């Protein structure tokens, strides 16, 4: 389909210092980025900052877990997050209509030593007020 051709722009950058002006994005979508951010709360606040009024933020990431090997082998900084903490961060970023729900799938990986992990995933959604 070409109906929306030219209306989507992809940007690569630091989630904690997005090089865009405030209120420019209709939507921000992030997949498995928070657990790699030194300050995930700041990343959420920054993503909310660039949203237009009624713009939507949708993130998926790992639920809290104990697979320490992911820090060394996958450059994870955080071992997932609790839904309550993510909801709190969305609220502090002045988002409304917040939902943090479990996804119907797992993030699976195998360590260099053969350890297997199947970690729950959440999907968090919010709307800029």
Model-found features: residue ranges?
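Short conserved AdoMet
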Residues: 3, 38, 52
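Conserved SAM-binding strand-loop segment of SAM-dependent methyltransferases
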Residues: 4-18
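Conserved Rossmann-like nucleotide-binding pocket used by diverse enzymes
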Residues: 11, 29, 58
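A short SAM/SAH-binding and catalytic strip from SAM-dependent methyltransferases
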Residues: 26-39
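Short N-terminal helix/helix-N-cap motif within the alpha/beta-hydrolase-1
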Residues: 38-42, 67
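A short glycine-rich, Lys/Arg-flanked "PGG" loop and its adjoining helix->strand segment in the class I
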Residues: 41-56
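C-terminal alpha-helical "lid/dimerization" subdomain adjacent to the S-adenosyl-L-methionine
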Residues: 58-118, 123-125
